[in-house]
From Swiss-Prot:
Biological role stated in the UniProt entry: DNA-dependent RNA polymerase catalyzes the transcription of DNA into RNA using the four ribonucleoside triphosphates as substrates. Specific peripheric component of RNA polymerase III (Pol III) which synthesizes small non-coding RNAs including 5S rRNA, snRNAs, tRNAs and miRNAs from at least 500 distinct genomic loci. Acts as a long tether that bridges POLR3C/RPC3-POLR3F/RPC6-POLR3G/RPC7 heterotrimer and the mobile stalk of Pol III, coordinating the dynamics of Pol III stalk and clamp modules during the transition from apo to elongation state.
Biological source species: Homo sapiens (Human)
Region (Disordered): 110-223
Compartments, as annotated in UniProt: Nucleus; Cytoplasm
Keywords associated with the record: Antiviral defense, Cytoplasm, DNA-directed RNA polymerase, Immunity, Innate immunity, Nucleus, Phosphoprotein, Transcription
Example GO molecular function: chromatin binding
The name this protein goes by in its record: DNA-directed RNA polymerase III subunit RPC7
Listed Acidic residues bias regions: 174-198, 205-223
């Protein structure tokens, strides 16, 4: 091609001398030795103290950490539920204890409250009944009940009498209506019979031309 110099050789895109060696020189050998050690530090860490006191404090710290994790108010990150549940997780024991707070040591604002329904207004009937004089003695109560029963029986008897009178009046009106209907029906039947008799008695005398205008009795045609 016209852009390339020569055939079969590619031109370098950078200066080789800038890398540190000239043309024809060999590349440096690969170093297979470990790197040099980290230089010595001026400030070294303090050595750990050993003894019974230190071991006791370490054990106490671990126990405190475990007890804090077992408390019910310790927030744990929720585990992602896998599609396939492991058999071992099904029977794992939960070591958390149920925390029953002592509300004497905590403020009242933190205590949860259950919503209670407010009692509605009392019915008016109960108030009206309470306004009357209370009947304390049993004798007064019995007398009051007897009076009410007598009043109820009297009212019932009056109502029954009124119903009987109303039924009698209705029966009388019904009989009158039936009589009127029967009379009208008889008059209607008499009128029908008269009309039928008139049709039967409609005859012609001798010598009258019966059906003169009709075409059926004509022997010859008239022009």
């Amino acid at each position: 091609m016209a852009g390339n110099k020569g055939r079969g050789r590619a031109a370098y895109t950078f200066n080789i001398e800038a890398v540190g060696f000239s043309k024809g020189e060999k590349l440096p050998d690969v170093v297979l030795k470990p790197p040099p050690l980290f230089p010595d530090t001026d400030y070294k860490p303090v050595p750990l103290k050993t003894g019974e006191g230190e071991e006791y404090m370490l054990a106490l710290k671990q126990e405190l950490r475990e007890t804090m994790k077992r408390m019910p108010y310790f927030i744990e990150t929720p585990e992602e539920r896998q599609d396939i549940e492991r058999y071992s997780k099904r029977y794992m024991k939960v070591y958390k204890e149920e925390w029953i707070p002592d509300w004497r040591r905590l403020p009242r604002e933190m205590m949860p409250r259950n919503k209670c329904k407010k009692a509605g207004p009392k019915p008016k009937k109960a108030k009206d009944a309470g306004k009357g004089t209370p009947l304390t003695n049993t004798e007064d109560v019995l007398k009051k009940m007897e009076e009410l029963e007598k009043r109820g029986d009297g009212e019932k008897s009056d109502e029954e009498n009124e119903e009987k009178e109303g039924s009698k009046e209705k029966s009388k009106e019904g009989d009158d209506d039936d009589d009127d209907d029967a009379a009208e029906q008889e008059e209607y039947d008499e009128e029908e019979q008269e009309e039928e008799n008139d049709y039967i008695n409609s005859y012609f005398e001798d010598g009258d031309d019966f059906g003169a205008d009709s075409d059926d009795n004509m022997d010859e045609a008239t022009y």
